[in-house]
Amino acid sequence: MSISGTLSSYYVDSIISHESEDAPPAKFPSGQYANPRQPGHAEHLDFPSCSFQPKAPVFGASWAPLSPHASGSLPSVYHPYLQPQGAPAAESRYLRTWLEPAPRAEAAPGQGQAAVKAEPLLGAPGELLKQGTPEYSLETSAGREAVLSNQRAGYGDNKICEGSEDKERPDQTNPSANWLHARSSRKKRCPYTKYQTLELEKEFLFNMYLTRDRRHEVARLLNLSERQVKIWFQNRRMKMKKMNKEQGKE
């Protein structure tokens, strides 16, 4: 009971004391009670000031101070970002993302970040070429000789001209050049070999006009097409007529 009595008296005294202190300023002018309140302020100065321990900086020494040149060149709105000085080796392994493949070969000691990993080079479709690796051709000498022999086989001049090409091809990337230098549909003249010309002359002297069967046989023997044999005989007859006209005029 004594404890409860002391507590109740303490609360009552505190309420009464605060009301008694706050009441005079409300009833009377502030000038009369200005001086008595000053000792109260002096009493509060006796208490020791609160001292807080300084906290460690969040980022530490990793953030370097801004250089005056960078701050002067850029406006005040944009703050230049400076890369941290150096991250510990233990933290660097956690900076790697799971998408980045780990390098297979480690850099030599002393090179540091200057070491560059050799990237594969793209060659033909389905092939990867690395730097510093020699290229080997799968074609042997026997295979090359076989290809050359196949190219030399047959008559070199007996090829049928299937299309004409200009002597100077225009630039394929320039449409105006393609339009100005359009290729003509006329085919090139295919010269006959001496053997073919001799055999055709013999056949012409024997008969100026060939039947279809004979023309097919001559084309097969001379490795020509029936159309080539037919055109050659037509040109030969026109040439003979021209020669006869010139001889008649003389």
UniProtKB/Swiss-Prot annotation:
Q: Which organism is it from?
A: Mus musculus (Mouse)
Sites where Phosphothreonine occurs are at 133
| Name the UniProt record assigns to this protein | Homeobox protein Hox-B9
- Tell me which SUPFAM superfamilies the record gives: Homeodomain-like (SSF46689)
Q: Entry's InterPro entries?
A: Abd-B_homeobox_TF (IPR050803), HD (IPR001356), HD_metazoa (IPR020479), Homeobox_CS (IPR017970), Homeodomain-like_sf (IPR009057), Hox9_activation_N (IPR006711), HXA9/HXB9/HXC9 (IPR017112)
> Which CDD domains did the record assign?
homeodomain (cd00086)
Annotated PROSITE patterns: HOMEOBOX_1 (PS00027), HOMEOBOX_2 (PS50071)
For this record, the Gene Ontology CC terms, alphabetical, are:
nucleoplasm; RNA polymerase II transcription regulator complex
Q: Which UniProt keywords apply?
A: Developmental protein, DNA-binding, Homeobox, Isopeptide bond, Nucleus, Phosphoprotein, Transcription, Transcription regulation, Ubl conjugation
Give the lineage: Eukaryota, Metazoa, Chordata, Craniata, Vertebrata
Region ranges (Disordered): 21-48, 160-182
